[in-house]
């Protein structure tokens, strides 16, 4: 299936070229493995603009945003 993926902040270099990815898994955990992103480094994940857990299933055409842990203060 084809996904649009955008990684943010420190994960930005792991965004697929052009943001498009041919995905061969079923869920967010599979996607993180395919992108070589450790699960601990993907703290906030959106699919089609909705926050999801790492066990969320993905479907063809989904737009995925992956954010690392953030801090501030």
Place the predicted regions along the sequence by residue:
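Ubiquitin-like/PB1-type beta-grasp interaction modules and other compact soluble beta-rich domains
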Residues: 1-72
């Amino acid at each position: 299936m084809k996904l649009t993926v955008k990684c943010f902040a420190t994960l930005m270099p792991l965004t697929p070229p052009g943001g498009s990815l041919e995905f061969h898994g079923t869920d967010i955990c599979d996607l993180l493995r395919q992108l070589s992103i450790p699960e601990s480094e993907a703290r906030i994940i959106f699919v089609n603009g909705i926050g999801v857990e790492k066990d969320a299933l993905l479907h063809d055409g989904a737009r995925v945003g992956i954010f690392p842990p953030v801090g501030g203060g």
